[in-house]
């Protein structure tokens, strides 16, 4: 009895270590090698689990070991951003982490159904399909962890991060299936080598295209305004003066200034000129993109938005964009329209309305800025729609004071830089406190500001208008993995490898009685 218990505990420990390896790559980008084999224990044990229940538990262990440490900053976000008491924030995080672990449990269930003889491509297909379909609040993908391997990032222009996730999962599965079988390992290793060589070639080609595009200088201003200062009405003029001063220090004046999200916390009417404080901004020839809480009337009642405004060189509003993808528990409370009493749990949570759709801010005939507000630069589909609307430059404005100096800042940028590669556009990110940066179309960070310091920097960008395969085809590769998983998993037999010499898998169910 003791030996099976020890064996089970050892298996769960290895599963937890695999999950922790993935988490480490998201907590410390330099730990990216750990992510390559993070799925190996799950792929090794789930197909061989004695029962489906055991496989599900295996998945939950690996999933919790990934989600709990990697995204623990969500506790602080829910507590400070949503205004929930700390015990409530911890409860919500426990629910979110457990929900995220269900992705691993789903994959484990599929692997258990297929059994050990499943095709070696089944596990990576199932994992990639789960990444695409599973509704994680923070939309991380395994491939996102490889930020520092620039040649591999270039696959983003073809199909986003999914081919890289697939290749990483394929290698992990090959290692645990037959670690000494060179033929099994050769295919994923060769695929990764091809992606690396192709990516190196594409970096050179894209750099040449960028050199031919029109230059456009963007001034990013990071005010380092804390939450208390930001919400204090009496400090508003002082805060704006800080942004003015930092902007004046940029010489020569840039073609565009970008200030962070909700620089103006009180409501700006959609049809008004800028507030007098912003209208008096020195250096009027420079257009300005800034964030503000705004409102308009709908059936006589005010409706509130989280907005980005373009102030023209003449001091008048020349465009606006209202955030579409709102953060639950921060900008709205889910189901509060059905159960209004939910608002009493967090009076500080906003009551914003989503905007109508993607938009561009026309700074000039060539400079069409695609505004993204905070979380929106994590969403590939939303950013592609913004580029489809005509954006030649992407600009994120964010208020990251809620996160403090946590892993959230690095993870946000780690995911966001993929949008530059996927669309071959420059991406500038103006944040309130941390990690304001500029990213070029191959994913390099070309400019960045220090954490929790007031500073400004001029980023030399180029205006690009080309279309990538990912923009044209969307998530075709991801959908292919979904269809492949469904086809292979339609029955245990369908998921089995047809490779010569593959032994049949063990039968499940009640064993047949033999004759005495």
Language model features with spans:
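Cytoplasmic C-terminal tails of single-pass
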Residues: 501, 507-516
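Soluble catalytic domains of enzymes that build or remodel membrane lipids, polysaccharides, and related
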Residues: 203-473, 477
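Membrane-embedded alpha-helical bundles of multi-pass enzymes
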Residues: 2-206, 404-405, 416-420, 431-439, ...
């Amino acid at each position: 009895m003791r030996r099976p218990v020890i064996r089970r505990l050892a298996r769960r420990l290895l599963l937890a270590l695999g999950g922790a390896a993935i988490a480490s790559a998201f907590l410390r980008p330099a730990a990216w090698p750990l992510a390559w084999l993070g799925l190996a224990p799950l792929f090794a044990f789930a197909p061989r689990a004695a029962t489906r229940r055991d496989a599900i538990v295996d998945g939950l262990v690996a999933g919790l070991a990934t989600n709990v440490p990697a995204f623990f900053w969500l506790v602080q976000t829910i507590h400070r951003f949503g205004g929930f008491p700390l015990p409530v924030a911890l409860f919500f995080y426990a629910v979110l982490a457990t929900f995220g672990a269900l992705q691993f449990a789903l994959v484990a269930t599929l692997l258990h159904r297929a059994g050990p003889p499943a095709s070696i491509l089944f596990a990576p297909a199932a994992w990639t399909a789960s990444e695409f379909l599973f509704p994680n609040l923070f939309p991380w993908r395994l491939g996102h962890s490889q930020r520092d391997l620039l040649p591999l990032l270039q696959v983003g222009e073809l199909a986003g991060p999914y081919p890289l996730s697939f290749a990483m999962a394929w290698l992990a599965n090959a290692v645990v299936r037959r670690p000494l079988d060179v033929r099994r390992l050769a295919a994923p290793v060769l695929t990764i080598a091809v992606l690396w060589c192709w990516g190196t070639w594409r970096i050179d080609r894209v750099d040449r295209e960028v050199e031919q595009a029109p230059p456009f200088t963007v001034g990013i201003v990071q005010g380092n305004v804390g939450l208390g200062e930001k919400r204090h009405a009496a400090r508003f003029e002082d805060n704006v003066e800080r942004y003015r001063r930092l902007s004046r220090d940029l010489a020569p004046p840039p073609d565009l200034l970008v200030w962070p999200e909700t620089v103006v916390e009180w409501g700006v009417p959609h049809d008004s000129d800028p507030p007098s404080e912003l209208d008096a901004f020195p250096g009027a020839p420079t257009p300005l993109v800034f964030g503000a809480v705004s409102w308009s009337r709908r059936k006589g009642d005010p409706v509130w938005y989280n907005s980005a405004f373009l102030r023209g060189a003449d001091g008048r509003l020349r465009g606006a964009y209202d955030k579409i993808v709102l953060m639950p528990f921060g900008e709205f409370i889910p189901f509060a329209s059905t159960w209004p009493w939910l608002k009493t749990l967090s009076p500080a949570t906003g009551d914003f309305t989503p905007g109508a759709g993607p938009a561009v801010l026309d700074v000039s005939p060539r400079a069409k800025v695609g505004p993204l507000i905070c979380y929106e630069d994590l969403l590939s589909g939303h950013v592609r729609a913004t580029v489809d609307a005509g954006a030649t430059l992407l600009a994120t404005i964010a208020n990251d004071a809620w996160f403090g100096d946590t892993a959230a800042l690095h993870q946000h940028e780690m995911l966001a830089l993929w949008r530059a590669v996927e669309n071959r556009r420059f991406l500038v990110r103006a944040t309130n406190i941390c990690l304001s940066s500029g990213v070029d179309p191959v994913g390099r960070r070309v400019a960045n500001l220090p954490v929790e310091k007031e500073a400004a920097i001029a980023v030399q960008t180029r205006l690009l208008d080309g279309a990538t395969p990912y923009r044209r085809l969307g998530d075709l590769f991801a959908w292919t993995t979904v269809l492949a998983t469904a086809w292979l998993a339609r029955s245990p037999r369908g998921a089995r490898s047809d490779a010569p010499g593959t032994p049949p898998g063990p039968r499940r169910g009640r064993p047949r009685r033999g004759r005495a």
